[in-house]
């Protein structure tokens, strides 16, 4: 899913503009749209870029998804690793009121921002990582999905069906371990699609390959069609392929 996140960002992204207040005191290249609103002409989901769903401290963690054991170990390490900027803040303000739980990169495990998270329902006294280590993955959170502003509940049936197809595609598709060098390419791809995914010359980078975004999307959507057809047959519908 991490490799395919640009596909989700492009098709479901719904935040090409942001409130001007979010940019106060920050360097940016966003353009004025209307009063109080900034945007980029070819943006898809600025929420998923460096001005939104990001945490610079957490990017240094290098939490890996290649296997569950390493993921759990990396997550637990982050909860006990001090982060100097947080340490400088201290735990209490001048009046003795608490301002943070601790000075660690993650104050609690649920603070970890990521595009996808494996989850297990914790039992009494368990942390999320302990639940994963003890009983494995029960479900997966897909967190790269913008709220649909045209839906009363933030998502429509078509989008839910598409996410079901891509989740099944990711489950069945062979996926090699993700090295740091490729993670850098994935970060570049995500930035490209977030900021200029609707540009005609938007590109996707892979190890030893480069694609126009449109061509890359078509490759994967075409590969998903048999799964969509199978789901259509199973549930007597056509929503998965439409």
Residue spans for each PLM region:
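Core structural elements
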Residues: 134-138
């Amino acid at each position: 899913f991490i490799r395919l996140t640009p596909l989700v960002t492009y098709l479901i992204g719904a935040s090409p503009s942001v409130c001007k207040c979010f940019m106060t005191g920050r360097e940016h290249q966003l353009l004025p749209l209307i009063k109080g609103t900034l945007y980029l002409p070819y943006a898809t989901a600025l929420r998923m870029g460096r001005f939104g769903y990001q945490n610079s401290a957490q990017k240094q963690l290098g939490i890996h998804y290649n296997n569950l054991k390493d993921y759990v170990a990396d997550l637990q390490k982050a909860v006990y690793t001090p982060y100097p900027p947080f340490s400088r803040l201290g735990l209490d303000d001048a009046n003795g009121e608490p301002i943070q739980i601790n000075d660690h990169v993650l104050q609690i495990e649920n603070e970890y921002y990521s595009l996808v998270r494996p989850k297990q329902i914790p039992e009494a006294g368990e942390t999320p990582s302990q639940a994963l280590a003890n009983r494995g993955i029960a479900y997966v959170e897909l967190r790269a999905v913008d709220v649909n502003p045209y839906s009363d509940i933030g998502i429509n049936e078509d989008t839910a069906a598409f996410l079901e197809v891509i989740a099944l595609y990711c489950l069945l598709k062979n996926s090699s371990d993700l090295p740091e060098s490729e993670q850098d390419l994935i970060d570049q791809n995500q930035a490209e699609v977030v900021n200029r995914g609707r540009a005609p010359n938007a590109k996707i980078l892979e190890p030893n390959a480069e694609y126009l975004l449109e061509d890359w999307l078509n490759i994967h959507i075409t590969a998903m069609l048999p799964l969509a057809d199978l789901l259509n047959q199973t549930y007597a519908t056509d929503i998965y392929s439409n």
